[in-house]
Amino acid sequence: MSKNAIGIDLGTTYSCVGVFMHGKVEIIANDQGNRTTPSYVAFTDTERLIGDAAKNQVAMNPHNTVFDANRLIGRKFDDGSVQSDMKHWPFKVVNAGGGKPKVQVEYKGETKTFTPEEISSMVLVKMKETAEAFLGHAVKDAVITVPAYFNDSQRQATKDSGAIAGLNVLRIINEPTAAAIAYGLDKKGHGERNVLIFDLGGGTFDVSILTIEDGIFEVKSTAGDTHLGEDFDNRMVNHFVAEFKRNDKKDLASNPRALRRLRTACERAKRTLSSSSQASIEIDSLFEGIDFYTNITRARFEELCADLFRSTMDPVEKALRDAKMDKAQVHDIVLVGGSTRIPKVQKLLSDFFSGKELNKSINPDEAVAYGAAVQAAILSGDKSEAVQDLLLLDVAPLSLGIETAGGVMTALIKRNTTIPTKTSETFTTYSDNQPGVLIQVYEGERALTKDNNLLGKFELSGIPPAPRGVPQIEVTFDIDANGILNVSAQDKSTGKQNKITITNDKGRLSKDEIERMVQEAEKYKADDEAQKDRIAAKNALESYAFNMKQTIEDEKLKDKISEEDKKKIQEKCDETVRWLDGNQTAEKDEFEHRQKELESVCNPIITKLYQSAGGMPGGMPGGMPGGAPGAGSTGGGPTIEEVD
């Protein structure tokens, strides 16, 4: 089997990575020791930060810290949800050519724009590196999860993100399906169970109903809303902005930094309210020197979000209808996603199922990555007993079809059809001697195509002249296991064929663009490495200078060193520290050059000192300069990366 394939849960707010090894899944902690990593990327004057480091500095740098890429990916700039999200985002989203949204930031003093795919790929690189650090070797293959309700263009764009991150994406799978694997993996031999996965995450909401029996996971239906979750935070933020306006007559909305600090406090309060009945918010000097101290009760929060909480039941009903199941037939209700910790959501769900106990046996933050890791192991040929005979049968979330006369949507593949699947239908011409047909492919549930989403179109030309209704054109829809569609059309009389992989020509990145982005990603990575080395060199010089000052002050050595030598070292060290204070952003070789200079003054004196003292008293403080963490590698001691 290939070296470990990993499973990545690429979430809207947090991401998580797992790997299947030695017969079980390991969820891997990042360099900060956290098992989930914020899906944040930040750009500063000197560096690019990803994950915790990016989220930690967001209040100081709100305009250049990008998050929620999942809400942009595979969407058009004019999309209603993109427009409404932009009101809440402190970073700038611009309309790049072809109606694609791009994020605009300042990086190292220049204005840069990035596609949502590139931002997501940076988060994926972080997850990939987290796994590599744990496994001790490079990782190539991955399974990446997406919300079940993602449409074709969103799936394709996620796959492209993987390619930009240098990953070979074995498969794109749906989050609730992945969570079901995490839930059902150890439940073999329990007979057939109908399981409802209720997945309420940081930005999306999915409900899937599966039947699990003897390692076969068959999705019966899926429903959802690609927009929910973070809206809970927005409600609380808006509530406090209004309170601040009432009490202090000031409008917070005009200040991104204040809003960001408030949002961070609201996120924390929301979590607190899942376990206590009230939370306090204390923010010093929030706006124009005014401190903001306030409380919010659980009841108040529930009232602010009442309609949102209630709306989570609609997809549950829809999924049951589509699965042709009654409430009573559901054996297990499994909670996934951080927002399912909200007591009100749990109560509504339990009441909907007539007071049924909810299943909390899996970790809601890690279940999706867990399932993805299992699927990655299966696809890369793992032979271990735990994943033997596991079969995943997923479904297409939306109906797919073509436009026929009068703008009617004719569905070839109905929603919730098990994938992979292939189906053909024969169509004909609308007018006499029509030389060609335009095949327009749509996804959605509405009767008219204008209300559905156009995926792409192509022309089948060269049809021999014939009266209307005579030519026979066979249209074939073929969905692969990633949920990505191929469409072909063939004129039966001539055998002439034309086909298109619906990769959403308008919105999709071309091969060349992906190539270019891969190279840029490499370049950014090299920049990040250089920045790390630069800081290591700076820290090395600083610690060397301070160590020297300490050495000459050492009680044991004080009298062994002449005043003149002492003064020489003292002055050179002070000069170095002064230079450091004024040149924090100098280049690596400047720091190294300064260190050599300082060593040339100190080393002869220190050597003389130790020769006269007869051997080294317990090793020289800080080690010789080579041992300081500047010599290209990170030294022995802990170096602290986070530099604000």
From Swiss-Prot:
GO biological process: response to heat
SUPFAM superfamilies, sorted: Actin-like ATPase domain, Heat shock protein 70kD (HSP70), C-terminal subdomain, Heat shock protein 70kD (HSP70), peptide-binding domain
Single GO MF descriptor: ATP-dependent protein folding chaperone
Annotated signal peptide: none
Domain of life the protein comes from: Eukaryota
Family statement drawn from the similarity comment of this UniProt entry: Belongs to the heat shock protein 70 family.
Protein name in the entry: Heat shock 70 kDa protein
Source organism of this protein record: Brugia malayi
Lineage: Eukaryota, Metazoa, Ecdysozoa, Nematoda, Chromadorea
Gene: HSP70
